[in-house]
Structures are given as structure tokens and as C-alpha cells.
Regions:
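Conserved GNAT acetyl-CoA-binding A-motif
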Residues: 141, 146-160
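Conserved catalytic-core motifs of GNAT/GCN5-like acyltransferases
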Residues: 98, 157-159, 169, 174-190
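Conserved acetyl-CoA-binding loop-helix of GNAT-fold acetyltransferases
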Residues: 127, 133-146
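Active-site rim helix/loop that mediates acceptor-substrate recognition in acyltransferases
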Residues: 60-87, 91, 95-112
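A short beta-loop-alpha structural element at the N-terminal edge
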Residues: 38-51
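Conserved acyl-donor/pantetheine-binding loop and adjacent beta-alpha core of acyl/acetyltransferases
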Residues: 90-126, 132, 179-187
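N-terminal, intrinsically disordered charge-dense segments
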Residues: 22, 30-35
Length: 197
């Protein structure tokens, strides 16, 4: 697979927030002058070792998934899977794939066949602990929303784990009154964000 310098939907690399919004040319210029090179890119084969390492460091109450399982999401829908890079280091990643039911896929198993549908299932969002609070997760979600709108998805579903419900509420997701498989861990919550056409 060819290296993707950008997933094609942004008109600028995502730069560090320096005194203003990330879209401010002065902020981007200043960040560049400090030597920061940040971008959201599509996942490529060489990215996976960094993703696995990052996953091990952030999932404490849910067992990390295998490479085969994670790659099954990516191979099914590579255009909705991203990494956030800073100076060529993976600081965060997001995996999402097409889905056709409000019952979430089971963890630890590759995706079944025939999952195409109008739902985009956000399987995983992880950011290095050292980068917490810098807005990386929000930037990855913003990129996913752009892509989802362009591809015509009607909604995004996810299962909030590790007490992350409040974070997801701030991103526009609402809890659903539906139990999820116990493999997602204690307190896991199914959530939805409806996409406006």
C-alpha cells in the first residue's frame, strides 16, 4: 500500500495549538518554526507496531486486542482509520468501519463478513498518556466526521469503555439504553451520534 501523506480531506496538516485555533496560519507557522511536524494520516502497514505499543499503554481495564483483530477493521475500511503523527511518531490512532446493526461487534474476534451498512462503528480511539489533554482525540474525531459525511454514513456508533462516557458526550454522542456484551468491560456504554445530511 502506498504511503498516504494525508487522508485527503484536510486542507492543511494538523498543527499544535499555539495561542489560537489550529486553523490559524500564524499558529501553524509558529509551530512549524519550533520544529513541530504534525499530521493526521491513513494507517499503513509500517504503523502497526506503534499502534500495538500504544494500545498496550492505554487499555488497563479492557484486554488489548490482537494485531489480526485490529487489522480486520482497517482492511475492511482503510479510509476511516487514521493515526496522528508528531515528528513521525504515532501519538494517537482511530479505527472505524462500516456496520449494519446496533449490536456492536464482539471484541477479540475479526470482523464477520457482510458488515456493510449505513452505520460507521468507531471501534477504537487511543492517545498516548503523555499526550493527554492536547486535543489529539478531538482532531481524530473531527477527521472521522468529515470522512463519514463524505461517504454518506447516517450515524456513528461506539462503545465507551474505561469511564469515557463524559468525553464522548462532549463530542456529540448520546448514550443508548441497550446492554453491550460483557467483553467490553464493566460500565461499558453504547453511544450514538446521528450525522446530519
Amino acid at each position: 500500500m502506498a504511503f498516504l501523506p494525508c487522508v485527503g480531506f484536510c486542507d492543511y496538516d494538523v498543527m499544535r495549538k499555539v495561542g489560537s485555533c489550529v486553523g490559524c496560519p500564524l499558529s501553524r507557522r509558529y509551530a512549524t518554526s519550533l520544529g513541530y511536524k504534525m499530521s493526521i494520516q491513513g494507517i499503513v502497514s509500517s504503523t502497526w507496531s506503534d499502534i500495538l505499543q500504544l494500545q498496550q499503554g492505554v487499555y488497563l481495564s479492557v484486554e488489548p486486542e490482537s494485531l489480526e483483530v485490529l487489522q480486520s477493521k482497517w482492511l475492511r475500511s482503510p479510509e476511516t482509520c487514521f493515526v496522528f503523527n508528531e515528528d513521525s511518531q504515532v501519538m494517537g490512532y482511530l479505527l472505524a468501519h462500516s456496520w449494519n446493526t446496533e449490536i456492536p461487534p464482539k471484541l477479540f474476534k475479526p470482523l464477520p463478513s457482510n458488515t456493510e451498512g449505513s452505520i460507521l462503528f468507531l471501534h477504537d480511539l487511543a492517545v498516548r498518556k503523555s499526550e493527554s489533554g492536547k486535543g489529539i482525540g478531538k482532531k481524530l474525531i473531527a477527521q472521522l466526521l468529515k470522512t463519514a459525511h463524505l461517504q454518506g454514513y447516517e450515524q456513528i456508533l461506539l462503545v465507551a469503555v474505561q469511564n469515557s462516557v463524559n468525553f464522548w458526550k462532549k463530542q456529540g454522542f448520546i448514550p443508548l439504553n441497550q446492554k453491550v456484551n460483557e467483553c467490553y468491560g464493566e460500565g461499558a456504554q453504547l453511544m450514538r451520534r446521528v450525522l446530519v445530511a
